Amino acid sequence: MSEQREGLAELRARFDAIDSELLRLVAARRAVSRRMAAVKLAEGLPFHDPAREAALLARVQADGSRLNLPDALVKPLFLLLLADSLQVQRQEEPTAT
């Protein structure tokens, strides 16, 4: 194997490790969403909080900008995470019988 191919294999291994960590973090975020649902239910709060969502998007877009990440990546990524969080929280809501 050439040096370039070994370098490519190492870089792919780094991608694989990063991807695994991203998935672990998404799973952790979903676990927090489930706990958040319990708190919101106990306190009679709505699952969807547009003001909090807007503040979070502004924060992550600013963070992304500082990291030289394009907004075209950051915003859709976090909109997807927010939608998933809301879905997870709604799944925790007791069903009416």
Protein language model features and the residues they cover:
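Domain-level signature for soluble enzymes in the chorismate/prephenate branch of the shikimate pathway
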Residues: 1-97
